[in-house]
């Protein structure tokens, strides 16, 4: 047999071999396990043809698991977490439409194969094999990761972080109704259902609990949510058992969520219960928790040795309940297939998969950094252009505030104006978060927006950042451009995986085919007077600095904020980008620059067509001493510049970075070309701050004759009251640092002065 080529010199992991051989042996003997549930094909209205199709998908999934381990032993495959024991989910791949977006668990092989049969031209077996061997021709990830995903099948790829996909599934469900209410074109049909599968152990994760809680919270407001949560309960999380009644007792009484239990070993029971779930979600638009009890075969993954935590008897007990044997028993008792026919189907599928595996291992893998990194940024699809709002529309929407547009305004007001203009321009833009509605946000940045655009486009969420960002991802899957708000920078850490693990990786793991554009607004940074402490004055953005493909913008003044926000929306809408927009809290209401009453930090609101391009820096002044800074640092540097010029006769050029990730390297190097001295003013902490990236850039790319110094925040949390001033850069410390740079005293390191 062809498989011998893989087996040569390889010892198959014992349990995979046992399960494989036992299936054939028991089928030939007609030795089938007793069903755990009473649902019959007749009662479930499951016909012969469909049942055999399910069996075929189950067999294919099982054999793919086995061959994945054989290939792994030869170094030809790289992933062995399989679907063995979960093959009952093949039924779900048929009951639900291929147009229903599915966020899948990593044990969804049979589901994927069965759904692939719904669309001509999709070879599910080949696609899975290409993914297993990390082939560059893998149609979903291009060999970047083993995922279940397909654009034609409406299956976005998911990460391996358990439960992390539940919040976006909820957001996608929300998007279906929201698109219909707003009369917007939708990628998903109005009667679509969102599917989200996961394991019993995942249900315990905080992210799952947050999503189920949010789901109940939304349904309590009688809002439609067509979603089916599919918990594939195999009774164990790697090595930790799940109490048999735990899932049911913890979920069945949740308000607003229908609980349906089914026997995942009985395809008739899954078929009947899945159709019930489909009706509740599709027709009644109500969320369902479908609890599918199954077993786990072959351990957690190929490297998992079950005997370390399970007895031989426990392992054999699970193997005796092989779902393939259960399905074979149903087919035999119904007279739909003979014993020999089932064996032949199994062996024919083995030959098919072996042949396709031989083809797959010959496929080239990615061979360069450029090729691998190509999908960090989504593919740019041609999008409908949205026109800027005309004067009549603006006058109508702004109403009483329209005449204020010509007045000089602060940062907070200019962001509000910009959001208003953008909401008029982009009908698929949604603003949401904690207190953004009637209250208008903690700092009134979103004041009056709900009155201007209604509760369907500007809405409050429950107080859970995981749900906020996850909802944004899900909405983006269906064509919306979400603009979620995180109330304070410190709160981002409650949900950073939704940004780091989910939103930022979708394009990468889908070869740029899927995108979840958004502009995530965060009230950020320190220097607030009379309010806060650390949790309202967090000055660390380290968590945002190393996210491939994510753009981080941070304005220092009103006009820049408006122009940059417009660019961020364009990047999200036209290029599918994920953008984080950091708004310096301390500058929201700032009016004066040099002295009380000078109104030096109030500016006219820029025309709606004015934008600042990504990577374009702000420049103020001239001189061979250059300050590189952003946000509050730019404001303080402007104050320091006046003193330096008037009291010390020192001319300073100040560069407002504006774009913190990726750093605007070309613009920086251009502006410092004639510089002799560089001062970096970074309000972030000394460790992990933007200053580190700037220092590296200057060391590697700038003139070795430059004198360089940085002043940063201390490696400390921000305290309550006024004590923060001892930790952060100030006007005085900037002045002192610039004066020190003028000295001829040099600490030399390769000819370069470095003072930190």
Task: Annotate each PLM feature.
Residues 529-625:
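Phosphate/diphosphate-binding glycine-rich loops and adjacent basic-rich segments that engage nucleotide
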């Amino acid at each position: 047999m062809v498989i011998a080529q893989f087996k040569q010199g390889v010892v198959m992991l014992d349990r995979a071999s046992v399960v494989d051989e036992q299936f054939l042996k028991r089928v030939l003997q007609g030795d089938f396990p007793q069903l755990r549930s009473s649902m019959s094909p007749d009662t479930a209205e499951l016909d012969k043809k469909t049942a055999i199709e399910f069996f075929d998908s189950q067999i294919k999934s099982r054999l793919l698991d086995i061959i994945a381990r054989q290939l792994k032993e030869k170094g030809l495959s790289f992933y062995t977490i399989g679907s063995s024991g979960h093959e009952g989910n093949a039924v779900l791949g048929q009951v639900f439409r291929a147009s229903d977006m599915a966020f899948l668990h990593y044990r969804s092989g049979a589901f994927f194969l069965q759904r692939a049969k719904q669309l001509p031209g999709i070879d599910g077996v080949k696609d899975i094999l290409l993914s297993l061997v990390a082939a560059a021709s893998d149609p979903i990830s291009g060999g970047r990761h083993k995922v279940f995903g397909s654009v034609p099948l409406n299956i976005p790829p998911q990460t391996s972080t358990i439960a992390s996909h539940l919040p976006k599934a909820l957001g996608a469900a929300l998007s279906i109704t929201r698109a219909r209410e707003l009369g917007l074109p939708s990628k998903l049909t109005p009667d679509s259902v969102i599917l989200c599968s996961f394991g019993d152990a995942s249900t315990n994760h905080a992210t799952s609990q947050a999503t189920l809680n949010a789901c109940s919270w939304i349904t309590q407001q009688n809002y439609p949510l067509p979603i089916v949560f599919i918990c594939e309960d195999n009774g164990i999380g790697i090595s930790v058992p799940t109490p048999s009644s735990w899932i049911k007792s913890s979920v069945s009484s949740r308000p607003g969520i229908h609980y349906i239990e089914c026997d995942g070993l009985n395809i008739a029971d899954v078929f009947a219960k899945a159709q019930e779930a489909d009706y509740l979600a599709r027709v009644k638009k109500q969320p369902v928790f479908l609890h599918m009890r199954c077993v786990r075969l072959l351990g957690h993954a190929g490297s998992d040795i079950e005997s370390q935590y399970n007895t031989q008897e426990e392992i054999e007990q699970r193997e005796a309940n092989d779902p393939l044997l259960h399905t074979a028993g149903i087919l035999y008792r119904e007279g739909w297939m003979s014993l020999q026919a089932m064996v032949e189907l199994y062996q024919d599928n083995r030959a098919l998969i072996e042949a396709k595996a031989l083809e797959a291992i010959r496929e080239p893998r990615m061979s360069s950094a450029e090729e691998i990194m190509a999908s960090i940024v989504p593919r740019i699809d041609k999008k409908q252009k949205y026109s800027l709002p005309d004067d009549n529309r603006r006058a109508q929407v702004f109403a009483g505030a329209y005449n204020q547009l010509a007045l000089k305004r602060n940062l907070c007001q200019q962001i509000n104006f910009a959001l208003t203009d953008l909401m008029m321009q982009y009908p698929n833009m949604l603003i949401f978060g904690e207190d953004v509605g009637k209250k208008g946000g903690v700092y009134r940045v979103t004041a009056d927006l709900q009155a201007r655009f209604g509760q369907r486009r500007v809405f409050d969420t429950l107080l859970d950042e995981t749900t906020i960002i996850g909802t944004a991802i899900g909405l983006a899957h269906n064509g919306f451009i979400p603009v979620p708000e995180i109330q304070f920078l410190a709160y981002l850490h409650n949900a950073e995986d939704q940004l780091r693990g989910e939103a930022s990786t979708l394009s990468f793991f889908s070869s740029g085919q899927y995108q979840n554009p958004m502009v995530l607004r965060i009230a950020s940074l320190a220097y607030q007077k009379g309010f806060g402490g650390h949790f309202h004055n967090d000055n660390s953005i380290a968590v945002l600095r190393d996210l491939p493909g994510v753009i981080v913008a941070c304005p220092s003044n009103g006009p820049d904020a408006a122009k940059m926000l417009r660019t961020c929306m364009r990047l999200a809408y036209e290029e599918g980008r994920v953008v984080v927009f950091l708004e310096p809290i301390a500058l929201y209401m700032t009016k004066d620059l040099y002295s009380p009453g000078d109104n030096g930090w109030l500016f006219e609101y820029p025309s709606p067509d004015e934008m600042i391009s990504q990577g374009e820096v702000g420049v103020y002044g001239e001189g061979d001493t250059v300050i590189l800074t952003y946000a509050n640092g730019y404001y303080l540097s402007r104050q320091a510049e006046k003193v330096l010029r008037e009291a010390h006769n020192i001319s300073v050029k100040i560069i407002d970075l504006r774009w913190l990730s990726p750093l605007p390297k070309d613009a920086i190097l251009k502006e410092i070309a004639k510089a002799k001295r560089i001062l970096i003013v970074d309000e972030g902490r000394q460790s992990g701050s933007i200053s580190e990236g700037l220092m590296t850039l200057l060391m590697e790319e700038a003139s070795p004759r430059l004198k360089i110094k940085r002043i940063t925040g201390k490696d400390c949390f921000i305290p309550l009251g006024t004590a923060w001033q001892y930790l952060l850069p100030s006007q005085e410390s900037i002045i002192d640092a610039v004066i020190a740079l003028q000295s001829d005293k040099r600490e030399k390191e390769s000819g370069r002065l470095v003072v930190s």
